[in-house]
UniProtKB/Swiss-Prot annotation:
This is Pyruvate synthase subunit PorC. It catalyses: 2 oxidized [2Fe-2S]-[ferredoxin] + pyruvate + CoA = 2 reduced [2Fe-2S]-[ferredoxin] + acetyl-CoA + CO2 + H(+). It is an enzyme of class 1 (oxidoreductase). Its EC number is 1.2.7.1. It comes from the Archaea. It holds the Pfam family POR. One of its GO terms (molecular function) is pyruvate synthase activity. Heterotetramer of one alpha, one beta, one delta and one gamma chain. Keywords: Oxidoreductase.
Amino acid sequence: MIEIRFHGRGGQGAVTAAQILAKAAFYDGKFCQAFPFFGVERRGAPVMAFTRIDDKKITLRCQIYEPDYVIVQDATLLESVNVVEGLKKDGAVVINTVKDDLDLGYKTYTIDATGIALDVLGVPIVNTAMVGAFAGVTGIVSIESVKKAILDTFKGKLGEKNAKAAEVAYNEMLKKYG
């Protein structure tokens, strides 16, 4: 089983990102779960969401404490949240930042998802770009399924733009780390 923990801030779409990733895994023929961590979140406050992906039925119904991957939508969280807490020894981090030299003690993949979101969407909402970036560095889900999940989640032009943001991030990660 592959377990992914998303870190973001309220209003950044971390919960939606976890759901899109799970839906993409489903379209790829896998079993999946996506769920948020509910607390006293408010816009801008740190939030977490989770996705599980497996080739067989998932029976666990608890928070993910030892993820295989961590996806960080906002690098400023590094100042206040231990985003790598519990990350498995061979785990990896995908983080939205312009810095390429982050040392988090784990394999770290960086992408300027904010820049992509601003270019493609016109707003700094990075959730779909981060799912595309994750697909690009891991291959756990296909970009075709990611785009299909996005188009199911967001209708019309909004869906098309978000699918484009995911594809741009996916291709950037393939170019950078492929």
